[in-house]
Regions:
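Glycine-rich oxoanion-binding loops at beta->alpha junctions
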Residues: 59, 68-99
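Mixed-charge interfacial surface used for oligomerization/domain docking
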Residues: 167-221
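Gly-rich Lys/Arg/Thr-decorated short loops/hinges at beta-loop-alpha junctions or inter-strand turns
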Residues: 1, 45-54, 63-76, 140-143, ...
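N-terminal amphipathic/basic leader segments beginning at the initiator methionine
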Residues: 1-50, 194-196
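Short Gly/Thr/Asp-enriched flexible loops that form oxyanion-binding sites at enzyme active sites
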Residues: 113-127, 146
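Short glycine-rich or small-residue beta-strand-to-loop segments that form or flank ligand, phosphate
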Residues: 2-3, 49-56, 72-75, 101-110, ...
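Short glycine/serine/threonine-rich phosphate/pyrophosphate-binding segments
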Residues: 60-63, 86-90, 111-117, 140-143
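Short alpha-helices
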Residues: 135-174
């Protein structure tokens, strides 16, 4: 296991985000921090399509590290390996969304899809134009493996960048031009179909203060 400096495992995400915001002048916290862990751009442009992403913490620089020009307008951060709440996602949508609308970029995990999806539906009831794209790029879990199918991994970054560049250029339908995704069903949810990632690790992971979640086998002669 790698060594980490933690004052308190229970406050690790809050302290990490505080340090990040203090060292990056272009971002700030949304009102309600730390109960609502949302990092937004210091100056939000509501004349373009807004991009919002997020998920469980523990995979830095995701997601706050991708907030900035030509990228995300807001990152919604959950606890370690835990999805952010519906209330936090909805607060982010409300803060950054103008008349051009908002795109939620979500990785294919059950909690993320559920909470971002519920927040999107509530935002629509408030009259906001919200779309959601799901990134499922994991080569290790092709269908029918895995309960929820392919996970969303590092390929999500390319979706951030493609959609972010289109939004910054003023494209009115950045989710179509940046993501090249096809519509699925009647839930305003698209799936990014052309990104694949094979992930590997040299060490196991574990939430702060807990044992490793699994053991890597070692090769012997």
């Amino acid at each position: 296991m790698g060594h980490k400096f933690l004052n308190d495992a229970g406050a690790a995400v809050t302290e990490m985000l505080e340090g990040f915001v203090q060292s990056h002048p272009g971002v700030k916290f949304l009102d309600g921090f730390p109960d609502v862990k949302v990092v937004v751009r210091s100056h939000v442009d509501k004349n373009k399509v807004a991009l919002v992403s997020g998920g469980g913490s523990g995979h830095e620089p995701a997601h706050a590290g991708f907030v900035g020009d030509g990228m995300l307008d807001a990152a919604v951060c959950g606890d370690v390996f835990a999805s952010p709440s519906v209330a936090a996602v909805l607060a982010a949508i409300r803060h950054v969304t103008g008349s051009p609308g908002c795109l939620l970029i979500v990785k294919n995990y059950t909690g993320d899809r559920l909470n971002f999806g519920l927040a999107a539906e509530r935002a629509k009831l408030e009259g906001l134009n919200v779309e959601m794209v799901v990134v499922a790029d994991d080569c290790a879990l092709p269908p029918p493996l895995g309960v929820a199918g392919r996970r969303g991994l590092a390929g999500t970054l390319f979706v951030h960048k493609c959609a972010g560049a289109a939004a910054a250029a003023g494209e009115p339908r950045s989710w179509e031009l940046g993501v090249r995704a096809g519509r699925e069903g009647a839930h305003s949810t698209s799936k990014c179909r052309h990104t694949r990632v094979a992930a590997a690790s040299f060490i196991t992971c574990g939430a702060g203060g807990l044992c490793a979640s699994f053991v890597l086998c070692t090769m012997v002669d």
